[in-house]
């Protein structure tokens, strides 16, 4: 695991090529078909070297939860182990890693009709009014969720309307943790400025590869919008807004790079508090040797 642009894929491919391993992607952007450039999806050449499971498994119009990931990942892990191989989970979606390792609370699946009702109420009365509703049914979640966070606010109210129980009540029970021995590694540059430079370089390469055309094709479908989880992925939102004429090209680049750096900061914050983690430095010689030594 590690922040975006830290070299996770390169190390995973080296591991898969030289040892009896198969890769499982742990990335909330790579699951979507047609979102290849902006998600830094492994190239056809890289996938030939080391096939990745759990990429291209959803259309961008579809939702995909941490619970969906856990179920899919457990199935893939079992299959890889049954083949006599070692699963290697690689990615930067820390919520997915946490769900897999620790288990999840038994929350109800999304209900599109209820979500539409909640959105209609928000359009009519504002999210502040819905936040007051949440405060009445689940004061603990209301303290934690800001009125300006419509995604989490909507989900908390949706859970109550489906189940009759508050999010706080339901999250007190979790499914069983991962039933396997796990060795955990994080890879990142030692200096933040190096990571920032890598992020800027990678976004410029994405633009050269045709990222704007990729977003334009997604936009032209007509069934996608910026409230979807897929279109909230860093880079895609900013490019979509640029195509809408909200700002110029240079501002789009600046905003996309800044959003990606903020994502990396959040990822590193998660990792610094992560227990039992072995750290590797991006680009350092001998990372594979160090990794294999720790796994023995």
Curated annotation (Swiss-Prot):
Catalysis performed (reactions): adenosine(37) in tRNA + dimethylallyl diphosphate = N(6)-dimethylallyladenosine(37) in tRNA + diphosphate
Binding site for substrate: 4-9
Region of interest (Interaction with substrate tRNA), ranges: 27-30, 151-155, 232-237
Site (Interaction with substrate tRNA): 93, 115
Broad enzyme group: transferase
Gene Ontology MF: a single term: ATP binding
Residues annotated as binding ATP: 2-9
Cofactor: Mg(2+)
Gene Ontology biological process terms from the UniProt entry: tRNA modification
tRNA processing listed as a keyword: yes
Entry EC number(s): 2.5.1.75
Keywords from the UniProt entry: ATP-binding, Magnesium, Nucleotide-binding, Transferase, tRNA processing
Function, as annotated: Catalyzes the transfer of a dimethylallyl group onto the adenine at position 37 in tRNAs that read codons beginning with uridine, leading to the formation of N6-(dimethylallyl)adenosine (i(6)A).
UniProt record similarity statement: Belongs to the IPP transferase family.
Assembly, per entry: Monomer.
UniProt cross-references to HAMAP family, sorted A to Z: IPP_trans
The name this protein goes by in its record: tRNA dimethylallyltransferase
Organism whose genome encodes this protein: Shewanella sp. (strain MR-4)
